[in-house]
């Protein structure tokens, strides 16, 4: 099975639940771009939500991965430790194939790549804010201002 087929087939299906079914109704001209954007976003979500890894380490990996999404010349991110900490097999496989997802992004046409990078920039900034605001997530913590709430819900 080709890398693209595996990423946008079984791996996407296993981590996306109903979204995988939704992709079938999208125009074929945008299906692979949206599928890849979803896979990258799901990867960043897995990074941010791995509770067995300290929040500081998750933040570091999230920032490294965002840098790699943004810049083809940035070093690859090693998710070996993070993948080992996954209880969910599908998320483990997703992390193990993150380099292949990045390689697909690097091959995308400039406009498509730029749109995916923009979406992932917004998503990862929000995930970073969550890690700063809520840390390890063990204690309930309210947002302090209406602006914080607006930022959080964006």
Residue map of PLM features:
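Acidic catalytic motifs of isoprenoid enzymes
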Residues: 1-154
